[in-house]
Amino acid sequence: MQTLADLLNTIPAIDPAAMSRAQRHIDGLLKPVGSLGRLEALAIQLAGMPGLNGIPHVGKKAVLVMCADHGVWEEGVAISPKEVTAIQAENMTRGTTGVCVLAAQAGANVYVIDVGIDTAEPIPGLINMRVARGSGNIASAPAMSRHQAEKLLLDVICYTRELAKNGVTLFGVGELGMANTTPAAAIVSTITGRAPEEVVGIGANLPTDKLANKIDVVRRAITLNQPNPQDGVDVLAKVGGFDLVGMAGVMLGAASCGLPVLLDGFLSYAAALAACQMSPAIKPYLIPSHLSAEKGARIALSHLGLEPFLNMEMRLGEGSGAALAMPIIEAACAIYNNMGELAASNIVLPGNTTSDLNS
């Protein structure tokens, strides 16, 4: 059986030759050069992904939602009861949550995965990858052992690769877990080197008079656990959570197949920061869907070097932003594959070149 290190070493580089061919093709389409803006750049990025074989296209679409509880909830960093995690996970199996509705609109399947919900028995209808009944309280102990983090990463990577074998070419990540913006902020603070007060936000409507406590909890977690910012697994194990580990696994798994993965909001940025520490080669496969309204979002995205496509003032999580952005990926593929070419028309535009997919 492959180890985590083995799988990380399989992540292919983006193909610059394929991107150059795509650039020439797009410049020769029936439009002024660059007039479709970031849609053109996105199509070129997709063309460079080996899993798409040089031609931007979308097959099956999947949003993987990682569900877990967090011991740090006990510190009063969230106003929602912890039981909401399990209740909302059940609602996802019925297709009634935000991500389910948006994914259905986009023609994507939602995979609801229990990686650490705090219930006595597994919840029917969920994919069971549960490691434990919630992570440790990061204010007083590590979130999990390194072994637990590595095993979950490996399990999710393998599951993601199986979905790719079955025709999924576009992945989205999502999460569900009360209090999970606290470990996410701890990860962002650790890896970016920014102070907790710069990255800790209100999450799911935390009253502002409780924000100081949340900031203090993040600071205590980092001081106590001393995560190594250069070691993504160490950061996830010490101040993360099972849902964050799971999302990182999806990113690594998709990238190992040479396929794109749409980020969601703040939680996914934190997971991406950790995943990129494990393998910087995954970064070109990460596509930022939207700008989260959570404080610290810009800091995390800036560190990743990513600019989101949408700014809808969203902070639901669940993978809702990833699902919402899937039609943008399809639009980039459509202009690449379906637009006419200047060479076949009577139009001559300064700066345009003849399309050539074979040179």
Curated annotation (Swiss-Prot):
Top-tier EC class: transferase
EC number: 2.4.2.21
GO biological process terms held by the UniProt record: cobalamin biosynthetic process
Annotated metabolic or biological route of this protein: Nucleoside biosynthesis; alpha-ribazole biosynthesis; alpha-ribazole from 5,6-dimethylbenzimidazole: step 1/2
GO molecular function: nicotinate-nucleotide-dimethylbenzimidazole phosphoribosyltransferase activity
UniProt entry keywords in alphabetical sequence: Cobalamin biosynthesis, Glycosyltransferase, Transferase
Residue positions of the active site: E318 (proton acceptor)
Recorded catalytic activity of this chain's protein: 5,6-dimethylbenzimidazole + nicotinate beta-D-ribonucleotide = alpha-ribazole 5'-phosphate + nicotinate + H(+)
Gene3D superfamilies documented for this protein: 1.10.1610.10, 3.40.50.10210
One family name in Pfam for this protein: DBI_PRT
Keyword Glycosyltransferase: yes
Entry keyword DNA repair: no
InterPro entries named in the record: Nict_dMeBzImd_PRibTrfase, Nict_dMeBzImd_PRibTrfase_bact, Nict_dMeBzImd_PRibTrfase_N, Nict_dMeBzImd_PRibTrfase_sf
Family indicated by similarity: Belongs to the CobT family.
NCBIfam families named among the record's database cross-references: cobT_DBIPRT, PRK00105.1
Its job: Catalyzes the synthesis of alpha-ribazole-5'-phosphate from nicotinate mononucleotide (NAMN) and 5,6-dimethylbenzimidazole (DMB).
HAMAP family per record: CobT
Assembly behavior: Homodimer.
Protein name: Nicotinate-nucleotide--dimethylbenzimidazole phosphoribosyltransferase
Species name: Escherichia coli (strain SMS-3-5 / SECEC)
Gene: cobT
